């Protein structure tokens, strides 16, 4: 079962508590890094010392890869949209974690509901610039400050590159850069406005 143990004086922060899960007298622990364990149908991460993890963590997967996961204060793996405060950056970030299947809990990598995520983190333009290029799987996409992929309609035309014909659209940022995108949101060119 669960055990809470206070940290060792001089090695841990004062009054720091660590949670462990023991089965047959041994704590669940990772062979290396962090690994997932299922307890009462919920997933938790433990390090090599057996300490339960909380917050956003990079976890070792069974296939040898790693992925971003997020664990609440109780250590339970979270899924779906999560708003996470990054203490290092001093800012709130938007994340999305798979909600089902073999990747449940892993940071989503791709475009979901027209929003672009890289390993779970929503990619977004600086509010000052309005638009920013983001690379995903070998393509450059244009996103706005909410992470939405900017796309052309099938009938729209680019003024910057009229030779492309229909299915292209221009977006101008605050630095007078003009981004031309196709109907998928893939950047075709970047020019400076005349």
Language model region names:
Residues 1-194:
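Extracellular adhesion/carbohydrate-binding repeat motifs centered on closely spaced tryptophans
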């Amino acid at each position: 079962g669960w055990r809470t143990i206070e940290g060792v004086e001089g090695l841990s922060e004062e009054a720091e508590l660590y949670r462990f899960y023991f089965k047959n007298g041994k704590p669940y622990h990772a062979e290396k890094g962090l690994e997932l364990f299922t307890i009462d149908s919920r997933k938790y991460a433990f390090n090599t010392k057996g300490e339960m993890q909380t917050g956003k963590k990079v976890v070792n997967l069974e296939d040898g890869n790693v992925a971003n996961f997020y664990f609440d204060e109780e250590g339970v793996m979270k899924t779906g949209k999560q708003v996470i405060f990054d203490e290092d950056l001093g800012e709130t970030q938007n994340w999305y974690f798979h909600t089902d299947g073999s990747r449940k809990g892993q940071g989503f990598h791709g475009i979901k509901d027209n929003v672009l995520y890289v390993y779970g983190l929503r990619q977004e333009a600086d509010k000052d610039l309005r638009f920013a290029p983001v690379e995903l799987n070998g393509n450059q996409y244009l996103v706005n400050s909410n992470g939405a992929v900017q796309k052309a309609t099938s009938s729209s035309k680019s003024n910057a590159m009229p030779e492309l014909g229909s299915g292209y659209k221009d977006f101008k940022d605050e630095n007078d850069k003009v981004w031309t995108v196709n109907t998928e949101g893939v950047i075709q060119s970047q020019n400076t406005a005349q």
